[in-house]
Design a protein with these regions (language model features):
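A short, conserved structural fragment
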Residues: 69-79
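Short amphipathic alpha-helical interaction segments
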Residues: 54-71
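Short acidic, hydrophobic short linear motifs in intrinsically disordered regions
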Residues: 36-49
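Short alpha-helical segments that sit at the start of domains
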Residues: 2-37
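Short intrinsically disordered terminal tails
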Residues: 1-2, 116-117
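Minor-groove-contacting beta-hairpin "wing" of winged helix-turn-helix DNA-binding domains
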Residues: 81-88
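Short, amphipathic alpha-helical interaction segments positioned at domain boundaries
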Residues: 90-116
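Non-catalytic, well-ordered alpha-helical scaffold segments
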Residues: 21-24, 62, 88-89
């Protein structure tokens, strides 16, 4: 394809440019959960996205998670009947880049905030 670079960093930048707020929030909340040593799962994510007015269906939350998993930005593990979300090294790099660009505004996870109290 003309005009397409084979440079891996160009691919990473292109992938980041296509991520939306919902992807950013999954990366953010997964990282926050890991920092607090709390398992953050798809059900928590769905509740947080619903609370934030981003989605009304669990199917959308699962699709968001699956897209990030395919890009190797998160891992999803079945643990005790839950699908827990873990940020990868690539995901941490993506999150850092998204935060520094200021494209998205940080929003609190209701689940993680509840645990803080």
């Amino acid at each position: 394809m003309p005009g397409v670079s084979s440079n891996p960093s160009d691919l990473f930048e292109l992938q980041l440019s296509r991520l939306g707020e919902e992807h950013f929030l999954v990366l953010l909340w997964a990282a926050m959960g890991e920092d607090r040593q709390v398992k953050y799962n798809i059900t928590n994510l769905f509740d947080d996205l619903k609370h934030g007015g981003i989605t009304r269906t669990k199917q959308t939350a699962v699709a968001i998670v699956e897209s990030l998993r395919i890009l190797c930005l998160i891992d999803v593990r079945d643990e005790r009947n839950r699908k827990n979300i873990y940020i990868t090294g690539f995901g941490a790099k993506a999150l850092e880049k998204l935060i520094t660009t200021g494209r998205f505004v940080k929003k609190n996870s209701a689940f993680l905030e509840e645990l803080k109290q």
